[in-house]
Amino acid sequence: MDFSIKGCDWSKGSAKGFLTGKSDCIVLGVFEAQTLSGAALDIDEAAKGLVSRVIKAGDIDGKLGKTLFLHEVSGIGASRVLLVGLGKQDAFSQKAYNDAVKAAWRALLGTKVVQVTFTLAQLPVPERASDWGVRAAILALRNETYKFTQMKSKPDASAPALKRIVFSVDPADEKAAKIAAKQAVALANGMDLTRDLGNLPGNVCTPTYLANTAKKLAKDWGLKADVLGLKQIQALKMSSFLSVAKGSVEPPQFIVLHYQGAAAKAAPVVLVGKGITFDSGGISLKPGEGMDEMKYDMCGAGSVLGTIRAVAEMGLKINVVAIVPTCENMPAGNANKPGDIVTSMKGLTIEVLNTDAEGRLILCDALTYAERFKPAAVIDVATLTGACIIALGHHNTGLFSKDDALAGELLDASREAGDPAWRLPLDDEYQDQLKSNFADLANIGGRPAGSVTAACFLSRFAENYPWAHLDIAGTAWKSGAAKGATGRPVPLLAQFLIDRAGA
């Protein structure tokens, strides 16, 4: 799809080009109480009051998400007008904007419209300018058009008719909106990669598949890729990671991707993604119902790869390192057993009380490995705990950090990106739950505050740099009829890096 930006001040009569320009459809907003948006007023005047008459006749009442097509409207160049209900004007919000935009795209995608003029980005969203509206609209469109059919015998290769979208924006926002459009496309491409990796079955998206994906990213985007195999992982004494991997016939991989957008001496931001390509629970076997969704236990890895792809496409002036420890967690005669004690790369011994708490066992060695980069910050991303779903549901990602400044940056990025996160506690008192009679610490801390104690475990291996942990167990994928990977938290991570890069 092609996206272009044009400045237009509807209040100053500069909309002639939009009124007379040829397109298949122009999209206008209508508030409840028969109130037209600025663009709709101009179109209504050019059409000699047709829009007003349609509203007064009750064909569209302005309720949020309602849509109505008008055909062959005189006085304008577009062959159709799409009216979109915006709800109550005094209650118009970011969520209302997103809902209206989603309704518009769904209506348009059900037609053979090829070129659209889109005016909704200029709507008065509190604390937002046109550039934000453009970015949100592009991401919404890409989300609506995403489909995963690669594994079907007859994949759906059809593309939507919609090819060209012209956004009208406030003239003062035109430059920023062009940047926002490019960032949105890069971000959507990164999210699509994350979703594709998550949606692939575990017999396809293996650790080796993830490693090959990283190598392809390096080739396509000028990154440096280091993929460490079993012997190299053993040489690094990552025995905690290997204790999880040994129960599977699939060989483990330790992936390191480097993106250099700043001076070589500049400290990088390191992203660490959990890459359990299938999690059976190991000897502490999970229930059979819903176990198919454990292919999504590598969504942390997928989001890290998707983020670095987006960063490379944006060309951000920042250095980023992506680390992915990846393996399967399977039951076998040589698999981890409850009560086993393993030694981490850091040297701390860990009593494995539950083999289904394996994510922290692979992440702890990756967090130790990250020290060699002398990072500006380290953020790990993992589908780590069901307890986080109990605490936060499926809307907010769990955020843990002892660094208030870093946590604040991530929360700001989450709000800007519309990819919400919620900070949870990481008090030292919770560490007591991880005490072991036989090792330096246990890999679980009991049922109370399960997501907190998991983060506390990781914090023991992240003491030498600013660190944050994102628990995406509730936000990385959806179940039910809409089952599939979401692409989160790529928007949050990318926005954090955009902000860090000053882009």
UniProtKB/Swiss-Prot annotation:
PANTHER family given in the database record: CYTOSOL AMINOPEPTIDASE, LEUCINE AMINOPEPTIDASE-RELATED
GO cellular component terms listed in the entry, alphabetical order: cytoplasm
Gene3D superfamilies: Leucine Aminopeptidase, subunit E, domain 1, Zn peptidases
Organism: Burkholderia thailandensis (strain ATCC 700388 / DSM 13276 / CCUG 48851 / CIP 106301 / E264)
Name listed for the protein in its UniProt record: Probable cytosol aminopeptidase
Role of this protein: Presumably involved in the processing and regular turnover of intracellular proteins. Catalyzes the removal of unsubstituted N-terminal amino acids from various peptides.
Active site: 286, 360
GN (gene name): pepA
Superkingdom classification of source: Bacteria
Pfam families, per database record: Peptidase_M17 (PF00883), Peptidase_M17_N (PF02789)
Keywords: Aminopeptidase, Cytoplasm, Hydrolase, Manganese, Metal-binding, Protease
Molecular function via GO: manganese ion binding; metalloaminopeptidase activity
Transmembrane segments: none
Cofactor dependency: Mn(2+)
Ligand binding (Mn(2+) 2): 274, 279, 297, 358
Gene Ontology BP annotations: proteolysis
Localisation per UniProt entry: Cytoplasm
Keyword Nuclease set for record: no
Catalytic activity annotation: Release of an N-terminal amino acid, Xaa-|-Yaa-, in which Xaa is preferably Leu, but may be other amino acids including Pro although not Arg or Lys, and Yaa may be Pro. Amino acid amides and methyl esters are also readily hydrolyzed, but rates on arylamides are exceedingly low; Release of an N-terminal amino acid, preferentially leucine, but not glutamic or aspartic acids
EC number(s) given by UniProt: 3.4.11.1, 3.4.11.10
Main subcellular location: cytoplasm
Residues bound to Mn(2+) 1: 279, 356, 358
UniProt cofactor note: Binds 2 manganese ions per subunit.
